[in-house]
Amino acid sequence: MKIALILFLCVGVALADDIASAAGQIFNSILPNLISNSVTRQQGNSATNTLQQIGSVVGGVVDYAKKKSYEEMLKQVQDSTTDEDLLRISEEMFNADLNNALNYIQVNLQGKTSPMSKSDEAPSSLINVPENVWNGPTIRPFAALFDNYHKNVIRPEFVTPNEETEQVTYINTILATGPMRSLMNFLVSKGLNQMNEYQEQVELLKKIWFTKYARHWTGLCKCSCAFENVFMAELKSNEVLGLHSWLFFAKREMDRKANYLGYIDKLDLGGKGLILKQHSILSETKDAPELTMFVGTSPELETALYTLCFMARPDRPCKLRFNNVPFTIQTKTLKAENLILIDTAYPVF
């Protein structure tokens, strides 16, 4: 009996090694396709299908262990991530950002201003984005989400099947990019073994960024989500909330719904982007005295950085670095639907 048990355990170990080896071989074989597909914008292709195969192969290993709940995952990352981890992984994410757009857009800072000033120190637009940039492999599905929301926090919003498809398309697209692969590998290294499964990655990002919650004090209207606040803008009475995306701001400028008054301060991120603090008027009358945003960075890099800091340093300064330039991301959280979610997130320097 003992001999049979020993033989059974040996076979189990061998099978586990074979499964892990198979997963590694599959992933290495599709890396060229992942890079190519991120450039050619092909959706539902063999690379995506093979990623799902990785999920099922590695999932065979994960299923033998107890999967962590959402709350347990957040606590695990928060407790196990060191300050040095954050500096290292942020450098890695920036270096992996192949869809950086800084060299393809025009940024016209013009005059300096202050949060209290009402003077227009910038007669021209802040950002000019050429059409080919809007059609970029990750920017196109990102911008497709802009018309899915209404800026008023008490106006009801209902997610249609098409809008949910657009959410998943965006998530699938960015999961094939360098910054998001770095994030998922980092989460696995912190003990979140289920992040080896592709569908688990999709569900995590969908939960963090697209779970609907109420922002108004009545709590009656689930009219907001993290994506809408961070990457777009919301209005609560006359107060502008969010608006930390340079792409959304550029779109508002194109539509003549944003008037850039000038910049307050800026930080150069070693040629890979800027962090800009600026003053603008939205929708002709809504004052946004101190907006902070990355400029030129890709949607996937920003999503990866904000997700990292939400999980590792919620409600605290998340100190990062690129090319020896230090900066911080500040996240604020709220509890809704019995979940800890992103209230807002933005860069600070």
Model-inferred region functions:
Residues 315-349:
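A cross-kingdom marker for long, charged
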Residues 17-68:
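N-terminal, immediately post-signal peptide pro-regions of secreted/luminal proteins
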Residues 55-321:
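N-terminal "domain-start" segment
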Residues 2-16:
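Cleavable N-terminal signal peptides of Sec/SRP-targeted secreted and luminal proteins
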